């Protein structure tokens, strides 16, 4: 086998469709566009979502919610992630070094997800009420 002898498999490539090139091609004259009307003309397409003047669906439906500006800045950390950390005193820097919070985050909040059996101390981190109770039940403490 040589590079100059490699060819695609039989039927793998289709010839490009040439429209408007005679009656024998099956796509001559109107080039597969039919007769008259907006879609037969060049440039004859409406914008996406246009419904012929009827109020479009995306404008008929009500707006919902909003984009939180603090979402990117706050990272959630699970309790079972804290349990896996090798240190007993956990702060934001320790979470960053462990790769538990993204680089864009400025605040971390510990949430009640999973279990923690060992005593850890949180410094400068937020915690939900349930997470706080679980940490204190394991013998740890939370210093926000």
Swiss-Prot record:
Record's keyword terms, sorted: Ribonucleoprotein, Ribosomal protein, RNA-binding, rRNA-binding
BP terms from Gene Ontology: translation
InterPro entries per record: Ribosomal_uL15 (IPR030878), Ribosomal_uL15/eL18 (IPR021131), Ribosomal_uL15/eL18_sf (IPR036227), Ribosomal_uL15_bac-type (IPR005749), Ribosomal_uL15_CS (IPR001196)
Domain of life: Bacteria
Region (Disordered): 1-53
Pfam families recorded: Ribosomal_L27A
One Gene Ontology cellular component: cytosolic large ribosomal subunit
Molecular-function GO term, any one: rRNA binding
Comp. bias intervals (Gly residues): 21-31
Family the entry assigns: Belongs to the universal ribosomal protein uL15 family.
HAMAP family, per the entry: Ribosomal_uL15
PANTHER family: 50S RIBOSOMAL PROTEIN L15 (PTHR12934), LARGE RIBOSOMAL SUBUNIT PROTEIN UL15M (PTHR12934:SF11)
Subunit structure: Part of the 50S ribosomal subunit.
Function: Binds to the 23S rRNA.
Protein name in the entry: Large ribosomal subunit protein uL15
Gene behind the chain: rplO
């Amino acid at each position: 086998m040589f590079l100059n002898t490699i060819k695609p498999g039989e039927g793998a490539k289709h010839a490009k469709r040439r429209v408007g090139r005679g009656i024998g091609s099956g796509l001559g004259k109107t080039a597969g566009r039919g007769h008259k009307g907006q879609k037969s003309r060049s440039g004859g397409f409406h914008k996406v979502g246009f419904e012929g003047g009827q109020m479009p669906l995306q404008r008929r439906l009500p707006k919902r919610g909003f984009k939180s500006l603090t979402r990117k800045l706050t990272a959630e950390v699970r309790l079972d992630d804290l349990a896996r950390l090798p240190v007993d005193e956990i702060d934001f820097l320790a979470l960053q070094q462990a790769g538990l919070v993204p680089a864009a985050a400025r605040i971390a909040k510990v949430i009640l997800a999973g279990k923690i059996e060992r005593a850890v101390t949180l410094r400068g981190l937020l915690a939900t009420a349930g997470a706080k109770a679980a940490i204190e039940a394991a013998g740890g403490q939370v210093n926000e």
